[in-house]
Amino acid sequence: MKKILALLVIAPLLVSCSGNKNQVENEVFVKDTNGFEILMGQFAHNIENIWGLKEVLIAGPKDYVKYTDQYQTRSHINFDAGTITIETIATTNPAAHLRQAIITTLLMGDDPGSIDLYSDVNDIQISKEPFLYGQVLDNNGEPIRWEWRAAHFADYLLQNKMQTRTSGLHVISFVTIQLVPNHLDKRAHKYLPLVRKSAARYGVEESLILAIMQTESSFNPYAVSRSDALGLMQVVQHTAGKDVFKLKGKSGQPSRSYLFDPENNIDAGTAYLSILQNTYLGGIQNATSRRYAVITSYNGGAGSVLRVFHSDKNKAVGIINTMSPGDVFQTLTTKHPSGESRRYLVKVNSAQKNYRRY
C-alpha cells in the first residue's frame, strides 16, 4: 500500500505533463526541467517498487504507456515496433483486468489532453473514431471501431493468445497485438491535412515536416520525453516554443495542453522549422545545404551547427557557402559534437526521401 501511496503523491504533479487540460494549476511546478526530471525519476522508482526490477515502463516519444488498476495493469503501444502489449500483475482474475485494458486501448481517441499518462485512473474515453482504427485488425481481419467488436476481439485474445511470464516475485499475464504492417503510413496520412496547412503557411516542405514527425515521435500524439519535449514534433516549451510565440507576436511560451493538441503542435514545429530556415540559417545560400543545417539544428540547436564550421556565426555561414551540399552533410554527420545530432540528420534525410511521394 505504501508503494501505491507514493505514486498517488507524485502522479498529480506529473499530470500537467501528460497534457491534462483540467490540471493547468500544476504546470507552474513542472515548468522547471530539473523538477520534471526529478519527478520522473521518482515515478520510475515507484513503478519499479510495484512491478519489480527491469519492469519499469514509462511513456516516451515513441511509446504510449498507461497504467490502471492501482498501477497493476498497463497498456504499452510501441509505435516503432508496431506492437501493443497489455499486461497485468493482478493475481485475482487477471483476464478481467486485461479485457478492460484491451478494449479501452483499442478504442481510445487521439486527444492527449483527455488522458493522464501518470495516474492510474482509467480516464480513457471511448471514441467514435479511435486513434488505432485501421492500425489494428481483429481475428476476422476487420478494423475495430465499435465497442462490441473490441470486446469480441478481447475475448478471442484472452482465450487464444494470453500468456504469462515470471519477473521477480510477479507472474505477469499479458497479450500482444500486432499493428498492421503499414501502421506508420496510416498515422502519417491521418495528419497529412494539418501538415499541408502548416507547410503552406510557413513555406516549409511537407516531406520535411513528415520526416521530422516520424523521427521525433513515429506519429505518436501522446509523445513525451525526459527532456521536456512534447507532442508529435517534440516541441520544447521554453526554447522552440518561445521562439514560435515571439514569431506570432505573443509573449511567454506555449502551455503543455497547447502543445499536446496535434494541430497546435504541428503548427509550432513547422513555425520553428521556418525560423531556422529563414532567420537563424537564412544566410546559407544552397537550399540543400541549408536543409541539412535546419534538420540538425532542429535536434541540437542552430548555434551548435554553425560552431561545427567556425566559432564566429557569420564566418561559419561563409564557410558553408563555399562547400558543396555533400561536404556539408559529411561534415555535420562526422564532426558535430553530438552523436545524437549526427544520427538525427541521417535519419531525417532518409525518411524525407520516402515522403516526397506524398
UniProtKB/Swiss-Prot annotation:
- Its EC top class is lyase
Q: Does the keyword Magnesium apply?
A: no
Task: Name the principal localization, coarsely classed.
Answer: membrane
> GO terms for molecular function, please?
hydrolase activity, acting on glycosyl bonds; peptidoglycan lytic transglycosylase activity
What family does the Swiss-Prot or TrEMBL record give for this protein?
Belongs to the transglycosylase Slt family.
In UniProt terms, what function does this protein have? Murein-degrading enzyme. May play a role in recycling of muropeptides during cell elongation and/or cell division.
What this protein is called in its record is Membrane-bound lytic murein transglycosylase C
Naturally occurring in which organism (per UniProt) = Yersinia pestis
**Record lineage:** Bacteria, Pseudomonadati, Pseudomonadota, Gammaproteobacteria, Enterobacterales
Q: Which gene encodes it?
A: mltC
